[in-house]
């Protein structure tokens, strides 16, 4: 059954604004109302009460928004038709204050936001080893890797953050906990071995300056008994060399060739004796230092053994009371 003509809402009122508004503004208001969502249906009684209050209140000039005219007494009837409901409770699409908000196509999306992520810090956060340095040459300083963060699509209606979604937070927390547990296990492992050559014993050793002078090569660095290391060949016992049998040369055969050869032999013998004496002096000074260091280390070993026996006794009493570990 068709409704009476008085109950039908004219098409311009559904899409248009108040009376006297330009035709373009009415279409824009209708499009805005459709995009912003239809309002909930109002009860006829509430609409009538609002209409009575509007008639009773004095006309006030309001600042119109884009496409809206100033509400006055001349358009009260049009507002009643638009805002008021039909007998069946079907209200018209009345423009509300929410229409003054910026529209979707007027919003600016942050397409230029770029985040900088440190790759090594990201890997360490998740318990992964950092990127290995390139082979050969010193490793360069870690530079931040420019990684563009994912930005939302132009057509998306929500203001999604460019970072990862909250659903990834439990996975990141689990990875962080695993990395921390792995770091704790690594710290409780046996420490790496120490090079014994780099260990220095705290002791006072002041060798005689004359012995150091005899143990040093003239024009070279002073001999240091604390750091000097002898090779295995140098520490091998040297065999006793027998002297060569002397050969008597008559005076008439001692010419220039004989004297030059004898001079060279004497110089070689002198260099050999000096080198042997230098090595003997170095070994003696080094041996004096090692003897004193050995005595000090023996005292430390005795103290460590006493402490070890004490801890073993404590451990045995604990195992006897609470069982084996």
From Swiss-Prot:
Low complexity bias locations: 29-38, 71-80, 88-100, 166-176
Q: What keywords would UniProt list here?
A: Activator, Biological rhythms, DNA-binding, Nucleus, Phosphoprotein, Transcription, Transcription regulation
Question: Which CDD domains does the protein's record reference?
Answer: bZIP_HLF
Keyword Phosphoprotein listed? The answer is yes
Where does it reside?
Answer: Nucleus
Q: What does this protein do?
A: This transcriptional activator recognizes and binds to the sequence 5'-RTTAYGTAAY-3' found in the promoter of genes such as albumin, CYP2A4 and CYP2A5. It is not essential for circadian rhythm generation, but modulates important clock output genes. May be a direct target for regulation by the circadian pacemaker component clock. May affect circadian period and sleep regulation.
Identification of the protein by name = D site-binding protein
Can you name the source organism?
Bos taurus
Q: Which gene encodes it?
A: DBP
């Amino acid at each position: 059954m068709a409704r009476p003509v008085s109950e039908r809402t004219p098409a311009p009122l559904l899409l248009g604004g108040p009376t006297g508004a330009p035709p373009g503004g009415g279409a824009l208001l209708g499009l805005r109302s459709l995009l912003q969502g239809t309002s909930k249906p109002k009860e006829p009684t509430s609409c009538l009460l609002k209409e009575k209050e509007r008639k009773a209140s004095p006309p006030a000039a309001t600042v119109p928004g884009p496409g809206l005219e100033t509400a006055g007494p001349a358009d009260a009837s049009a507002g009643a038709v638009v805002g008021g409901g039909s007998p069946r409770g079907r209200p018209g699409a009345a423009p509300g204050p929410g229409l003054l908000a910026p529209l979707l196509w007027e919003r600016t999306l942050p397409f230029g936001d770029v985040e900088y992520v440190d790759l090594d810090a990201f890997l360490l956060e998740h318990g992964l080893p950092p990127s290995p340095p390139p082979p050969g040459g010193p490793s360069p300083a870690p530079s931040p890797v420019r990684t563009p963060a994912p930005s939302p699509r132009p057509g998306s209606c929500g203001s999604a953050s460019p970072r990862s979604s909250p659903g990834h937070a439990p996975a990141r927390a689990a990875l962080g906990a695993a990395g921390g547990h792995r770091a704790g296990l690594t710290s409780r492992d046996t420490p790496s071995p120490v090079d014994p050559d780099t260990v220095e014993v705290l002791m006072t050793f002041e060798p005689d300056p004359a012995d150091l002078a005899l143990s040093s090569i003239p024009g070279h660095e002073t001999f240091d008994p604390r750091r000097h290391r002898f090779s295995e060949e140098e520490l091998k016992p040297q065999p006793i060399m027998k002297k060569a049998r002397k050969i008597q040369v008559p005076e008439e055969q001692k010419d220039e060739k004989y004297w030059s050869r004898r001079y060279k032999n004497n110089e070689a013998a002198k260099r050999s004796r000096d080198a042997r004496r230098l090595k003997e002096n170095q070994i003696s000074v080094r041996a004096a230092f090692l003897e004193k260091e050995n005595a000090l280390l023996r005292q430390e070993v005795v103290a460590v053994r006493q402490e070890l026996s004490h801890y073993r006794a404590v451990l045995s009493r604990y195992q006897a009371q609470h069982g084996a570990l």
